[in-house]
Amino acid sequence: VAAAIILPFSVEQEHPIGWIIKLYSDTLSSYAYATLNTANWYYLLSANWAQLTLLTGRALPIATGCCALLPLLALATSCIRKKQPFLVRLLRTQNGQISLLCAVLSVYLFVVAAVGCTWSLYGYAMMALVYGTVILCCLHHSDAKHLPGFLALLLAGIYVLAVKVHERYLFPALGLFLLGYVCSRDRRLLWLMIGFSVTTFLNTAIVLDNSILYGSSLGHLNDDTLALNVILCVLNLLLLGFGAWVCLTPDWSAA
């Protein structure tokens, strides 16, 4: 489908294949900010419109790295309590592999904290965590009925935890949540669709309202709605946490 859409525009291009890659590359490079008016993790960290090359300070990557070790510690504790082989669960189970992924992220964050962590180094690592988690869940739950829900949760994870994100980037996920419910009958996906619809609507409404009132240069998540902005950020983080549970247990509703 993507090729059919791109092909008509490729005929007159000097580089029939490379032009689309360059277009996306140039577009992404123009968004060199931690977040762009999005009620997500980075807005809570006061990084709205913060240049990606700016340093985050050491506290953020160290704190995140410590939190990323918790799944591994929980797995080890569970193995000791149940007298199960740790390496088998670590390498062969979904939760074990995700725990290992988090541990790798933790080591990376400790290293960049020591040498100087920028928003780009931090944000791309969080993006890799989201992609890795969803891919592992897809591998362990390969039934096609789960795919729309996984894709929606991937977009939600990127929306909340990745850099270079606009407030409108979650729109496709809302339709995928609904499609995921139709395919899997998991009502949790409906709750996620409703929750993210509310936060995204309010987020976008604030930005558009400010653009109309003050012009495009001031059409942002400004301090005059700071309390609401923070509430939306917290709600999105809570929704993502709920979404992580859905992602890890896609067959829960059928149990």
Write out the residue ranges for each language-model feature:
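Multi-pass membrane glycosyltransferase architecture that uses lipid-linked
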Residues: 1-22, 31-33, 42, 47-255
